[in-house]
Regions:
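Glycine-rich beta-strand-centered segment in the early N-terminal region that forms part
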Residues: 17, 34-49, 62-111, 152-155
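C-terminal hydrophobic helical "lid"/dimerization subdomain
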Residues: 4, 14-17, 22-24, 264-268, ...
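NAD(P)H dinucleotide-binding glycine-rich loop of Rossmann-like/cofactor-binding domains
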Residues: 106-188
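Glycine-rich phosphate-binding loop and adjacent beta-alpha segment
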Residues: 206, 224, 259-321, 355-360
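A short acidic, Gly/Pro-enriched loop at the edge of an enzyme's catalytic core
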Residues: 241-253
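Local beta-strand N-terminus motif with an aromatic residue
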Residues: 93, 182, 228, 249-250
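Mid-domain Rossmann-like dinucleotide-binding core that forms the NAD(H)/NADP(H) cofactor-binding site
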Residues: 150-239
C-alpha cells in the first residue's frame, strides 16, 4: 500500500524558496524542483491547483498506469517560468492554463483531434499520473506548445482553474454527444464533472435538460444556479424521464456518476436509437446485458477526454458564457493539502471543488 503524505523536496532549490512542497504517493521518493528536459518543455510556477476524483483513484490504486512516487495533480493554472528552445507560443511571465492531456500535435490521432490517444510515449494522461503533476510549486509541462493556453487578462486564476481537465471533459462530452435543439438530455451525476458537463450542454440549447443525483445538496446547487434545469433522484428517474421526454426516453444521456448502478440506469433511460455518452471513470467492470439492450439500437460513446479545445473554453469564460467559480467551495494553502484531501474525499461541508494555493 502506498503511503499518502506531503513531503518537502530536496535539491534544485528556487533561490527564493528554501524548499519545494508537493503532494505525492511515494515509496522512497525525493521531490525536486522541475527542470527542463526537452526543447518543447516549459516550467510553470503553479499558482492554483485542484483535487480531482481521479487523484482519489490514484490514491486507492485504481489507476494501474500511475507511477508510484509521482507528484499528483492535473488541474492547475500558473505562470510560465522557463521555456525550452522550441517553444514560441508562450514565454516567461505568461499566465497559463495547463492541459491534463500531453500530446505531440502531429501524430495521426492528434491531427484528428483525438489527443487522448496521442502515440507519443508520453502522450495521453501523463501529468500527475506517469510524470510529476501540479499539486506542487512547480511543474514541468511536456509539449508546452500544445498543452499550455494563455489566460486572458480579464479571466482570473479561479475562473480558469478547471479549463484543462474537468471543464475540458464537460466540453468534449457535450460536443461528441451530437445534441440537437429538440433533444431531451439526461445528465446522470451532479458532481464537479457533471456540473461542468451541464454548463457545456446548456450552450447547445436543447429543449430539456434533466440532472439526476442521489445527493439533494448537489441538486439544490443545480436548482439555484440553473433554474431551468429539471432535477430528480435515482429512485424516481425512470418515471421522471418518461414524463419529461417526447419519444419514450432521453435523446441523449451523459453518464457522469460512475457508480455500480448508473451505467445500467443510463442506457435504460435512453430512447431507442439514442446516444449514450459515458464520461465517468469506473473502478470496476460494468455489465453489458446485450439481450436486454437488443432492439434499442443505442450508440455508445466513451473514453478519455480529447482536451484540445481549451482556448475555446477560455474564450467562452471571457465572454461570460461559462462560469465554474461557484464550484469552488473551499480554498486551502498547499501546506494544508492533506486536510483538503480529507474534506474532498469524505465530501464534508458541502464540498464540490477545492482550490489549492501554492503561494503562501
Amino acid at each position: 500500500m502506498h503511503e499518502w503524505t506531503q513531503k518537502r523536496a530536496i535539491g534544485h532549490f528556487h533561490p527564493l524558496r528554501p524548499a519545494i512542497k508537493t503532494i505525492v504517493i511515494h515509496q522512497s521518493s525525493v521531490c525536486a524542483r522541475s527542470v527542463l528536459q526537452h526543447e518543447r518543455d516549459a516550467i510553470v510556477r503553479v499558482t492554483l491547483s485542484s483535487i480531482c476524483t481521479s487523484d482519489l483513484h490514484i490514491k486507492h490504486g485504481s489507476v494501474p498506469r500511475a507511477v508510484p512516487g509521482i507528484t499528483v495533480g492535473h488541474e492547475m493554472v500558473g505562470v510560465v517560468e522557463e521555456v525550452g528552445s522550441a517553444i514560441t507560443s508562450v514565454k516567461p511571465g505568461d499566465r497559463v492554463a495547463v492541459n491534463v492531456e500531453t500530446f505531440c500535435g502531429s501524430c495521426f490521432f492528434c491531427q484528428h483531434g483525438w489527443v487522448n490517444n496521442c502515440t507519443d510515449p508520453n502522450g495521453g494522461w501523463a501529468l500527475g499520473c506517469r510524470i510529476d503533476g501540479g499539486q506542487a510549486e512547480y511543474v514541468r509541462v511536456p509539449y508546452a506548445d500544445q498543452g499550455l493556453d494563455k489566460i486572458p487578462d480579464s479571466v482570473t486564476d479561479e475562473q480558469a482553474l478547471f479549463v484543462g481537465d474537468v471543464l475540458a471533459t464537460g466540453y468534449w462530452a457535450a460536443q461528441i454527444s451530437e445534441i440537437k435543439e429538440d433533444d431531451t438530455v439526461l445528465i446522470i451525476g451532479a458532481g464537479p464533472t457533471g456540473l461542468c458537463t451541464l454548463q457545456c450542454v446548456r450552450l447547445l440549447h436543447p429543449k430539456r435538460i434533466i440532472v439526476c443525483d442521489i445527493d439533494e445538496a448537489r441538486l439544490d446547487f443545480v436548482r439555484l444556479h440553473y433554474p431551468e434545469v429539471l432535477t430528480t433522484t435515482p429512485d424516481c428517474l425512470t418515471d421522471f424521464v418518461l414524463a419529461n421526454s417526447d419519444h419514450g426516453g432521453a435523446d441523449v444521456v451523459l453518464e457522469v456518476a460512475g457508480s455500480k448502478t448508473t451505467f445500467r440506469m443510463a442506457w435504460e433511460c435512453a430512447r431507442p436509437n439514442a446516444i449514450v455518452t459515458v464520461v465517468a471513470l469506473y473502478n470496476g467492470p460494468q455489465s453489458l446485458p446485450l439481450p436486454d439492450m437488443y432492439g434499442k439500437n443505442l450508440i455508445f460513446k466513451t473514453g478519455g477526454v480529447d482536451g484540445c479545445n481549451c482556448a475555446e473554453t477560455l474564450k467562452l469564460i471571457e465572454e461570460g458564457k461559462i462560469d465554474t467559480t461557484p464550484l469552488i467551495t473551499h480554498t486551502y494553502a498547499l501546506k494544508d493539502i492533506e486536510e483538503a484531501y480529507r474534506v474532498f474525499e469524505t465530501r464534508l461541508d458541502g464540498v464540490i471543488k477545492i482550490a489549492i494555493k501554492s503561494a503562501e
